[in-house]
């Protein structure tokens, strides 16, 4: 571990030196790349620096206890020694986590797809509530949300919605939301007061740039048409809506949220790239299925990950056995406790596997 840490320190120092080179400063592409790498290494460098300082404090405290005759100074040194030893243990754990292999997609922006599942209109209402929950969470973090496409129902539900979230570390945080979400409550459409179980699926995909995924023009059909609202009424007198059909996969993308055909086309292609990149990522994940079974946030879209029980005001994440009784706050976007617990469980599983290896 410490060889890797020293290698990281050397790399950090090399980057810092390069950033002071006028030739690098004038090369904006290289400068930005180095700045990004330096920023990603900074937490590890800061933690390792504190670790080395604590180890030095332990040496100094032991020397005082060995050489000093003043009882008051020895008592202070003993207190400093105990504090430093405890902190060293914490820092060693933090360093192990920081040295875990990083998901190459963690720094990417994301495309989120929510689809109503079993439960008819109630499932569509739940899908719309999940959408609002994620929008509120993203806004609280200062992230930008951009709707790519959506299919609303007449009473405020959503059969499906696809949106982009732009913000630092969006994928690293939101990837744990992929899976089937289940709601248990008495639907507003239910006259006899029976509790119904409905579902909605969430897929969190890293945004794919053109360099990440190549789309051959001959594999795409582009149709333009007039945008329409609920019930099919025309909401635009120009052919601004865009539909993409990707022949090899059968994926169809429809975008009409913007007034400009060019903007709708850009959004449609962004969504298509994300879906194609996600297919490739899922293939790679499936090839490592055995290694992933013990991990949280594996992205298994069929996995029932969470239940929202309205009569009990309860939310349970089944992957980690976490139950919280603050459903109203969670539906309003307060999901950080759940995400933090998923991240911690994922890190613990990876550390355990690293220990086995």
UniProtKB/Swiss-Prot annotation:
Mind telling me which PROSITE patterns this protein's record contains? Answer: RF_PROK_I
Which Gene Ontology MF annotations are present? translation release factor activity, codon specific
The record, for Gene3D superfamilies, names: 3.30.160.20, 3.30.70.1660, 6.10.140.1950
One Pfam family, please name it.
Answer: RF-1
Source organism, top-level taxon = Bacteria
- Keyword list, A-Z: Cytoplasm, Methylation, Protein biosynthesis
Matching entries from InterPro entries are given as: PCRF, Pep_chain_release_fac_I, Pep_chain_release_fac_I_sf, Prokaryotic/Mito_RF, RF-1
SUPFAM superfamilies recorded: Release factor
UniProt-annotated location(s): Cytoplasm
**Record keywords: Ion transport included?**
no
An example Gene Ontology CC term for this record? cytoplasm
Q: What main location does UniProt list?
A: cytoplasm
Where N5-methylglutamine occurs, the residues are 233
- Record carries keyword Protein biosynthesis: yes
Q: How is it modified after translation?
A: Methylated by PrmC. Methylation increases the termination efficiency of RF1.
Coiled-coil-forming residues are none
Q: What function does this protein fulfil?
A: Peptide chain release factor 1 directs the termination of translation in response to the peptide chain termination codons UAG and UAA.
**PANTHER family registered for this protein in UniProt:** LD18447P
Q: What family does this chain come from, according to its entry?
A: Belongs to the prokaryotic/mitochondrial release factor family.
Protein name as annotated: Peptide chain release factor 1
Source organism of this protein record? Lachnospira eligens (strain ATCC 27750 / DSM 3376 / VPI C15-48 / C15-B4) (Eubacterium eligens)
Q: What is the lineage of its organism?
A: Bacteria, Bacillati, Bacillota, Clostridia, Lachnospirales
